[in-house]
Amino acid sequence: MLGKLVKKVVGSRNDRIIKRKRRLVKKINQLEPTIAALSDEALGRKTLEFRERLSNGETIDDLLVEAFAVVREASRRVLNMRHFDVQLIGAMVLNDGKIAEMKTGEGKTLVATLAAYLNALPGKGCHVVTVNDYLARRDAEWMGKLYGFLGLSTGVIVSNLDQEQRRRAYACDITYGTNNEFGFDYLRDNMAFTLDQRVQRDPFFAIVDEVDSILIDEARTPLIISGPTEDRSDLYHKVNALIPHLTRQEKEGGPGDYWVDEKARQVYLTESGHETIERLMVEQGLIGSDESLYDAVNIRLMHYINAALKAHALFQRDVDYIVRDGQVIIVDEFTGRAMPGRRWSEGLHQAVEAKENVPVHNENQTLASITFQNYFRLYEKLAGMTGTADTEAAEFHQIYGLEVVMIPPNRPMIRNDMGDLVYLTAREKFAAIVEDIKYCVEHGKPVLVGTTSIENSELLSGILRQAGVPHQVLNAKHHEQEAHIIAQAGRPGAVTIATNMAGRGTDIVLGGSLEEDLAHADPAMAEQVKAEWQQRHDAAVAAGGLHVIGSERHESRRIDNQLRGRSGRQGDPGSSRFYLSLEDPLMRIFASDRVAVLMQRLGMKEGESIEHPWVTRAIENAQRKVEARNFDIRKQLLEYDNVANDQRKVIYHMRTELMRADDISRTIEDIRHDVLGRMFAEHVPPHSLEEQWDVQGLQEVIEREIGLSLPIQRWLDDEPDLHEETLLERIIQEADAAYAAKVEAIGTQVMRHFEKSVMLQVLDNAWKEHLASMDHLRQGIHLRGYAQKDPKQEYKREAFEMFTGMLDSIKQEVVGIVSRVQVHSEEEVQEMEEQGRQPQEMQFQHAEVSALTLEEPPAAPPEESEGYAIPEGPRPFVRSGEKIGRNDPCPCGSGKKYKQCHGRLA
């Protein structure tokens, strides 16, 4: 009560921020006549003047008022678009490193130009991040004219650019590109072998468009660069053939071989399922007749079974993926776009390929990985724009330290958001949607229908075709035409069906796109085209504007709001309504019981709908539950990735320092001394008697590891007073002398090149193996909870031990190679480098997260061998240890049954 009163008197924090910004807007408006009086040349020279002032000690904020006035005037002259006052406020919020929430149609693309120009002045580069290549190209081309007029260069980063094109784009003052391309370029740069192979500069300032889509929706899915491992495609086909013999358990605890947990998106084998699958695998010769699936040696077979079960039970064709040209292509659940080249991890993609009977491609090994949370936190300053961020304001603040500021619209919103209509079945719901569409078409009202999957969009399209209603379909299968379809979706009576609208980036203008009409028309007919467009625009406005129909609720309220936000732009009239049924996934999983009881009480008949605040509240509560769960997943992923992130920073820093250095001989010397010190300590324990020394073992390990034969025993026999410190010093001196002789024989320059090449290759190989080990550790770490230990703390502890172990192994391997390998010329070193840097077929994954363990998935399961050898056919797995029954006590000592403890790892 008191809080409301205070807010009423002094305003909310958002109100106070906007109020402060309006004072700056006033100053910019006062400058407008002065700036408008400048010639084009004088206006363009302002950039040089601003840069000079920065070098003389002024700050970006000191220049803000004048710089914004200059950009506004340049935009008026070049683009014929003048920034509104609220757009200036939005850009100020971006410059502060905050998120500006601006409704659809408020001109976010133009807002970005102000903050991008101002932050590009220091010459460190400014990145504008969009959600797809089309928008990156469009915005770079469109706004590049404005930046060029002011003397700034513009680049664009999209897929299929070569290294030199990327380097040129990143060298520009302002670079447009997609979040995935920026992230993958960062990872690729940290896999480069020389500094001149890198393309990015140090991250300085980024403006993220559709920030909620990129930093929240896609934050559950890490970016992974991976390469192929052993070919096991035959196993996927064999296991896939077993799945149709299993029956699904209709309700938990009932008969059936597997249970599907739709909330967690997981599939579990039941008791009878284990027995059935074991019997089938014995018949197929995949395991021996006396083998159990839970024998330690067979546990990795569960990887293939789980992947095949998920592929059949959880992943549907035309919903989660499409099949095109013999390939399984993932469909992005947030945007409805097809994503060629992307692959699921954990063997899931291979299982889906086997299910669809298309060629199965190899599994992958992680070469480099980062989450969007950790990538975007590398920037000195980060800002974002979106139409819907307020529902996730707490998460933005908690994870990224970003505050959300709601920018008032230029014109008041007059859209009519009607209540949800709930039907008993999907059939009744679609019938009602078709009636609503027909009514709108008859009255000349444009309609946009949002669906959550390609399957539903095609189902609705089929119903409309039967009803004789002309319409356009916009989904992942037709995205080449999507910009054109959306541009014309505002014509009177136009019907457009679209999968999830997040990130489409093209405004729906009532009457259709005038720019597109003019682009395709004869210039002599321009006036007639404008008159026809005005007529269509007025007709669409008179009919009530764009009507948005939601065919079901998304699991996030924010994405529902994005769909609604397509209507009512810049004060236009509009309306929206969601049609739901008890068969919709969200209703079925989270809200059906309460709503079904309510419907029974009201005695609803077929074809009738219910519209009630209780229903809307029940649905919103269901969405909040899902949002909270997804937030937990993202938070958990970040906590686990932070451990890897600290290690990633160390390794990437080491690589950069290595590439920068011309001479690493001092580093090699320090490593050699460290390795010899460790060998010595293992065989000559500190403060021990000479009788306890393993001199023979020490001589052997030094000869084996660094190729140096030393008469240590003879030294001790000849010099009885030789104590351990002096002995270690002598060993190090001998090793240094032998290495110096080798350098002299080969040549200093050749040896320096050789040392650097070896160090980089060993570091990279060790890091790849370490990433795989971290993946495997993360997969099973949740089992520590059974032993009353905190999995996160255990993960941190073990990951640290693994990392220090990796660094020690790197040192030992480097010393061994540079000491033992014989090189004779620079050509030999270069040949060795080329062999180590064979171009590998890389895959760029935006992998889905495992909902069960709330972690980043591994790129591949642990394999027993490397390479590309194809097995000769079915071969039984041979048990090496004692058989553990599923109901026997677990060998770990927890007291639980094996199936309930470490047996669950499978």
Curated annotation (Swiss-Prot):
Keywords: ATP-binding, Cell inner membrane, Cell membrane, Cytoplasm, Membrane, Metal-binding, Nucleotide-binding, Protein transport, Translocase, Translocation, Transport, Zinc. Its EC number is 7.4.2.8. One of its GO terms (molecular function) is metal ion binding. PROSITE patterns: SECA, SECA_MOTOR_DEAD. Residues 553-576, 854-906 are annotated as: Disordered. GO terms for biological process: intracellular protein transmembrane transport; protein import; protein targeting; protein transport by the Sec complex. Signal peptide: none annotated. May bind 1 zinc ion per subunit. InterPro entries: Helicase_ATP-bd, Helicase_C-like, P-loop_NTPase, SEC_C_motif, SecA, SecA_CS, SecA_DEAD, SecA_motor_DEAD. Gene3D superfamilies: Helical scaffold and wing domains of SecA, P-loop containing nucleotide triphosphate hydrolases, SecA, preprotein cross-linking domain. One of its GO terms (cellular component) is cytosol. Residues 553-563 have a biased composition (Basic and acidic residues). It is a peripheral membrane protein. It is found in: Cell inner membrane; Cytoplasm. ATP binds at residues 87, 105-109, 507. Its cofactor is Zn(2+). Zn(2+) binds at residues 890, 892, 901-902. It catalyses: ATP + H2O + cellular proteinSide 1 = ADP + phosphate + cellular proteinSide 2. Residues 896-906 have a biased composition (Basic residues). NCBIfam families: PRK12904.1, secA. Belongs to the SecA family. PANTHER family: CHLOROPLAST PROTEIN-TRANSPORTING ATPASE (PTHR30612:SF0), SECA INNER MEMBRANE COMPONENT OF SEC PROTEIN SECRETION SYSTEM (PTHR30612). Monomer and homodimer. Part of the essential Sec protein translocation apparatus which comprises SecA, SecYEG and auxiliary proteins SecDF-YajC and YidC. Part of the Sec protein translocase complex. Interacts with the SecYEG preprotein conducting channel. Has a central role in coupling the hydrolysis of ATP to the transfer of proteins into and across the cell membrane, serving both as a receptor for the preprotein-SecB complex and as an ATP-driven molecular motor driving the stepwise translocation of polypeptide chains across the membrane. This is Protein translocase subunit SecA. It comes from Methylococcus capsulatus (strain ATCC 33009 / NCIMB 11132 / Bath).
